[in-house]
Amino acid sequence: MSAVLLLALLGFILPLPGVQALLCQFGTVQHVWKVSDLPRQWTPKNTSCDSGLGCQDTLMLIESGPQVSLVLSKGCTEAKDQEPRVTEHRMGPGLSLISYTFVCRQEDFCNNLVNSLPLWAPQPPADPGSLRCPVCLSMEGCLEGTTEEICPKGTTHCYDGLLRLRGGGIFSNLRVQGCMPQPGCNLLNGTQEIGPVGMTENCNRKDFLTCHRGTTIMTHGNLAQEPTDWTTSNTEMCEVGQVCQETLLLLDVGLTSTLVGTKGCSTVGAQNSQKTTIHSAPPGVLVASYTHFCSSDLCNSASSSSVLLNSLPPQAAPVPGDRQCPTCVQPLGTCSSGSPRMTCPRGATHCYDGYIHLSGGGLSTKMSIQGCVAQPSSFLLNHTRQIGIFSAREKRDVQPPASQHEGGGAEGLESLTWGVGLALAPALWWGVVCPSC
């Protein structure tokens, strides 16, 4: 048996004769700058493509007044070779969209675009007209009261829409407001695809809610009595069919307590609602939640945990009982056998040791819990599987594995290392809001 046939039978994929795998520059950029900040430059990563694939560069600039959105995709492609091409999809006056595309196979790293100069053509100031329009480019949403600009001469209508960009490592929603020379929802001027990036346009205002966004995990001794801040400065735009949500879960074991909260867009199909639920009541461990789904911009605006605490019945000072139990809440770890012990209140005659797994709303964590309960078979969530945006699962007397955020591990395309020194990394901050989660 030949060596080639043997390798094929063992599952090895052999390149076709004459077809060589290329190395390509690789990465994505999605950002909004001031027009005066252009041109920009970047440092791409490298990637090895499958045999037969080429390298591609796709760059687009969307300009509205003093702002410009830059979208860049670099990587491998199945598309046929194409010479560098600059396309003016829509030029002013007012909003404009221009792109650069290139596909090559002649050598490694032939997609070597490292700056926005091919699309950089400073324009002289336009003569002002009589129309004023809100001007905004944002991946987080344009808020009411956005600054209005005097539109250039030749524009007659204000544009307000949402561009959805999908493909080539790009997955984003761009809210666009600005000046246009005609009415209607036609910023793209018929364009449906630029390079590997598919584009759709929507001007139905009800289809793109803007919601507050952020997660928080806080552990303290008196969170069940004293309200704490629950605000975030970040926002996000929702997909069609989503509404805004805010979910807050309180766990109080006596000596310590934990709040877990999230704000953002809901799952598709959620209905408007607001409620407070006591899942486990004293004597012993208290577990309660506040959930709110709503369908107007920034309606998930509760500013403190008082929205939950004010709905809880007042608790008298507990009368000590005869049982002692370890007490602990570890939202990002495991309670140990050496947890502090406390005398349980009268009526709480058993010790609880288990964990609750929460996932959803940008958060995934297993919380280890120890405390006093009234019944030996008590489940703190009373078999509840959904708390607002959170999917919940409870187990007793099991050591949970290590916690991690949703989406942990390798993501899709790597982002670029900026030559201008801009870098952002999501993080979960202990005891404070994590807006980027």
UniProtKB/Swiss-Prot annotation:
Primary localization class, coarse: membrane
Highest taxon in the source lineage: Eukaryota
Subunit field text: Found in a complex with integrin ITGAM/CD11b and ITGB2/CD18. Interacts with PECAM1 (via Ig-like C2-type domain 6); the interaction is Ca(2+)-dependent; the interaction is direct. Interacts with serine protease PRTN3/myeloblastin; the interaction tethers PRTN3 to the cell surface; the interaction is direct.
Domain UPAR/Ly6: 133-210, 325-377
Transmembrane segments: none
Lipid-binding residues (covalent, GPI-anchor amidated glycine): 408
UniProt record, GO biological process: cell adhesion; cell-cell adhesion via plasma-membrane adhesion molecules; cell-cell junction maintenance; innate immune response; leukocyte cell-cell adhesion; neutrophil extravasation; neutrophil migration; positive regulation of neutrophil degranulation
Record's protein name: CD177 antigen
GO cellular component: extracellular exosome; lamellipodium; plasma membrane; plasma membrane raft; secretory granule membrane; side of membrane; specific granule membrane; tertiary granule membrane
Reported function: In association with beta-2 integrin heterodimer ITGAM/CD11b and ITGB2/CD18, mediates activation of TNF-alpha primed neutrophils including degranulation and superoxide production. In addition, by preventing beta-2 integrin internalization and attenuating chemokine signaling favors adhesion over migration. Heterophilic interaction with PECAM1 on endothelial cells plays a role in neutrophil transendothelial migration in vitro. However, appears to be dispensable for neutrophil recruitment caused by bacterial infection in vivo.
Maturation-removed propeptide residues: 409-437
PTM text: N-glycosylated.
Localization (cell): Cell membrane; Membrane raft; Secreted; Cytoplasmic granule membrane
MF GO annotations: calcium-dependent protein binding; integrin binding; protease binding
Bilayer topology annotation: Lipid-anchor; GPI-anchor; GPI-like-anchor
Expression by tissue: Highly expressed in normal bone marrow and weakly expressed in fetal liver. During neutrophil differentiation, expression begins at the metamyelocyte stage and continues throughout the subsequent stages (at protein level). Expressed by a subset of mature neutrophils (at protein level). The percentage of neutrophils expressing CD177 varies across the population. Expressed in granulocytes of patients with polycythemia vera (PV) and with essential thrombocythemia (ET).
Inducing factors: By CSF3/G-CSF in resting granulocytes. Induced during CSF3/G-CSF-mediated neutrophil differentiation. Induced during pregnancy. Induced in patients with polycythemia vera (PV) and with essential thrombocythemia (ET).
Native source species: Homo sapiens (Human)
Signal peptide per UniProt: 1-21
Carbohydrate-modified residues: 189
